Amino acid sequence: MNRLAVELPGLSLKNPIMPASGCFGFGREYAKFYDLSVLGAMMIKATTLEARFGNPTPRVAETPSGMLNAIGLQNPGVDYVLAEELPWLAQYDVPIIANVAGSTVEEYVEVAKRISKAPNVHALELNISCPNVKKGGIAFGTVPEVAAELTRAVKEVSDVPVYVKLSPNVTNIVAMAKAIEQAGADGLTMINTLVGMRIDVKTGKPILANGTGGLSGPAIKPIAIRMIYEVSQAVSLPIIGMGGIQSAEDVIEFFYAGASAVAIGTANFIDPYVCPNIIAELPALLDELGFDHISECTGRSWNNGQTVYCGA
């Protein structure tokens, strides 16, 4: 028995560990360190309809126990991803989760329709933290009705299951999750980064050219745990948890909160081997904790040992 295998909508994972979108590119740099086939899945960089250069520099700043980024969705566009990146990734035995971004519902729909047809794309991850240019620039992920509308539109055209990446920059993340569930999403990924800022004490100006950026890393882990704990009890969708994971113990904590798999982001910048190392360490930790299978850990903090999510 593979004690780490996880079944989710569209995803048969050999283990529940995957790199988070935006921290792993399309895997080319990390493939120099290890065989990407060891990963449970891989979330590729956000893809838009046209190529995007991203925000001006500086767009990364270190913070205590984390980092700020304002990359601005730099990517080569869906045509290039389909022609170059996904065919290159096909050499690895790893299911791909394609992160889809856009400025309008129509852009999301077009990207989703095209990228979901790629043979090694097993699921989509909707990045709903993008600003909606037709709604005054407000992020798709901050208004439940807007997020639900986007989810429904993408579900209608996608050939694969759709996971929605929840933004923590909301007053009621449970209401957001419920609206997305009712709109037909197949799963949730959470949490995205929190909006933050650093100011240079010598100049008195924000360090990031964009002013604000997304805070990630261990600093946001307690927030991610709390939000997953709340959402997992309110909806029936499987959750891929993320936010500051850097050890096997962190993975178990996310599972206890209610996650069924996890994604690792910022830690890849610190240690490129973090994903395979955690995969290797998990069986011994399960032994220590007295579990036969990783799925037994899901929702352990609130479910009295009952199965929370099992199977696709």
From Swiss-Prot:
It catalyses: (S)-dihydroorotate + NAD(+) = orotate + NADH + H(+). Gene3D superfamilies: Aldolase class I (3.20.20.70). Its cofactor is FMN. Keywords: Cytoplasm, Flavoprotein, FMN, NAD, Oxidoreductase, Pyrimidine biosynthesis. GO terms for biological process: 'de novo' pyrimidine nucleobase biosynthetic process; 'de novo' UMP biosynthetic process. FMN binds at residues 21, 45-46, 99, 127, 165, 191, 217, 243-244, 265-266. Substrate binds at residues 45, 69-73, 127, 192-193. SUPFAM superfamilies: FMN-linked oxidoreductases. GO terms for cellular component: cytoplasm. Its main location: cytoplasm. It is found in: Cytoplasm. GO terms for molecular function: dihydroorotate dehydrogenase (NAD+) activity. PROSITE patterns: DHODEHASE_1, DHODEHASE_2. The active site is at residue 130. Heterotetramer of 2 PyrK and 2 PyrD type B subunits. NCBIfam families: PRK07259.1 (NF005574), pyrD_sub1_fam (TIGR01037). This is Dihydroorotate dehydrogenase B (NAD(+)), catalytic subunit. It comes from Anoxybacillus flavithermus (strain DSM 21510 / WK1).
